[in-house]
Amino acid sequence: MSAIDKRVKEIVAEQLGVDEAQVTNEASFMDDLGADSLDTVELVMALEEEFDIEISDEDAEKIQSVQDAIDYITEHT
């Protein structure tokens, strides 16, 4: 597991209040981890802050799972 993978999973678990064991690469924020639209906005903001990147609204809508977030951050850092 890369440092990005590990940190994304930690942030997701912290932001959504779920156990890190539930945060698998395939996990959907809404369907599997119980996030609502506000949670996903806050999650994107936390990822932007942690990785010092800006995620456009258009791109944020495409980030639906843990793997989507990891892929996006890997490509943009």
From Swiss-Prot:
Q: What is its main location?
A: cytoplasm
Biological process according to GO:
lipid A biosynthetic process
**Pfam families to which the protein is assigned, alphabetical:** PP-binding
Where in the numbering of this chain does the Carrier domain appear? 2-77
Keyword Signal annotated: no
Secretion signal, residue range per the UniProt entry: none
Q: Which GO terms describe its molecular function?
A: acyl binding; acyl carrier activity
**Which GO cellular component term is one of those annotated?**
membrane
What InterPro entries does its record include?
ACP (IPR003231), ACP-like_sf (IPR036736), PP-bd_ACP (IPR009081), Ppantetheine_attach_site (IPR006162)
So, what pathway does this thing act in? Lipid metabolism; fatty acid biosynthesis
Domain of life from the UniProt record:
Bacteria
- Where O-(pantetheine 4'-phosphoryl)serine occurs along the chain? S37
This molecule's function is given as: Carrier of the growing fatty acid chain in fatty acid biosynthesis.
Report what the protein is called. Acyl carrier protein
